A protein has these predicted regions:
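Core SAM-dependent methyltransferase catalytic element
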Residues: 103, 144-178
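Conserved beta-strand signature within the Rossmann-like core of class I S-adenosyl-L-methionine
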Residues: 131-139
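Short strand-turn motif at the edge of the Rossmann-like AdoMet-binding core
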Residues: 109, 138-141
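Short, well-ordered alpha-helices that flank and scaffold nucleotide-derived cofactor binding pockets
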Residues: 14-18, 43, 127
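Extended basic-aromatic, gly/pro-enriched interface segments that bind polyanionic ligands
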Residues: 1, 24-105, 109-117
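Short conserved AdoMet
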Residues: 21, 46, 130
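A short glycine-rich, Lys/Arg-flanked "PGG" loop and its adjoining helix->strand segment in the class I
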Residues: 119-131
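Conserved SAM-binding loop of SAM-dependent methyltransferases across substrates and taxa
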Residues: 5-22
């Protein structure tokens, strides 16, 4: 949520591709309210000046495209889908089913909303979490309220919440974050 021009969604896709080594199917969704950001995310081309900040292990998934730009290779780009979402409009439909998501990342987004809107957004996002799914929020986004459907879990440097017990796969994510 709040994907801007897609860099975080691309980062998640790179990490998943590398960790899963093509052994499992995944889909990464990104949403934003700003249409130009969504257009840029969908295009998926980034300045070569950003490439040195991407660990070399992921360069195999990148290709040069045109003048001073790079993008994901087509097989990886097909794993990304971007859509428009106004987080305060719970009635706006999105291309996801309830309980579909193993992980929802909402990093540095809630800080722009009032507490009652944050509560409503978190409850909205929780509908899309699988029973063993995890909601990850930015380091500055501690919820100033409790939600009966979510419990906080220990994840270094960020705030994590789940519906039930923390899933086993989260241990690998927590180790990456250290």
């Amino acid at each position: 949520m709040g994907c801007s021009t897609g860099q975080e969604a691309v980062t998640i896709a790179l990490c998943l591709e590398n960790a899963l080594d093509g052994m499992q199917v995944y889909q990464v969704f990104g949403s934003d309210f700003h249409q130009q950001s969504l257009s840029d995310a969908t295009l998926g081309e980034y300045d070569n000046a950003q490439k040195p900040f991407i660990p070399a292990v992921y360069h195999q998934y990148l290709k040069d495209v045109g003048r001073d730009k790079f993008a994901l290779i087509p097989t990886m780009k097909s794993q990304l889908q971007f859509f428009s979402k106004n987080l305060v409009d719970a009635q706006q439909s999105i291309p996801l089913e309830a309980g579909q998501c193993q992980m929802i990342v909402c990093n540095n987004v809630l800080i722009y909303f009032r507490q009652f809107e944050q509560r409503d957004i978190v409850r909205y996002l929780a509908r899309y979490l699988a029973d063993d799914g995890v909601l990850l929020l930015g380091a500055g986004e501690s919820l100033g309220f409790s939600d009966p459907d979510l419990q906080q879990i220990a994840v270094p440097t960020i705030y994590g919440y789940c519906k039930t017990v923390a899933p086993d796969w989260l241990k690998a994510v927590a180790n990456i974050a250290r």
